[in-house]
Design a protein with these regions (language model features):
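Alpha-helical residues within the helix-turn-helix
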Residues: 12, 23, 51
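Recognition helix of helix-turn-helix/homeodomain-like DNA-binding domains
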Residues: 26-41
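Short, basic-rich loop-to-helix N-cap that marks the start of a DNA-contacting helix
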Residues: 38-51
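Short C-terminal boundary/hinge segments that cap the last helix of small helical domains
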Residues: 54-69
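Short alpha-helical DNA-recognition segment
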Residues: 15-30
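A short, Lys/Arg-rich alpha-helix, primarily the initiator
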Residues: 1-14, 20
Length: 69
């Protein structure tokens, strides 16, 4: 699942539109949709997005044996 698909799922689960998410993040819906189309999010973007939705964003590498680094 792409980051953009994950964001859409989060929005559905949080009962919020992507446009409303953008407004709460202090950006325009056009800007957020553009980032979603290009999959051009920074780690900071994703952390702020998660904070805006009241959830957490965890980043890690996962080795073939399932170990997270």
């Amino acid at each position: 699942m792409t980051i953009s698909e994950q964001i859409k799922v989060l929005c559905v689960r949080c009962n919020i539109s992507v446009a409303e998410l953008a407004r709460r993040m202090g950006t325009t819906p056009q800007n957020l949709n553009s980032k979603m189309k290009r999959e051009s999010f920074t780690i900071s973007d994703l952390e702020y997005l998660a904070e805006t939705l009241g959830c957490s964003f965890e980043r890690y590498f996962v080795l073939p044996d399932g170990e997270k680094i």
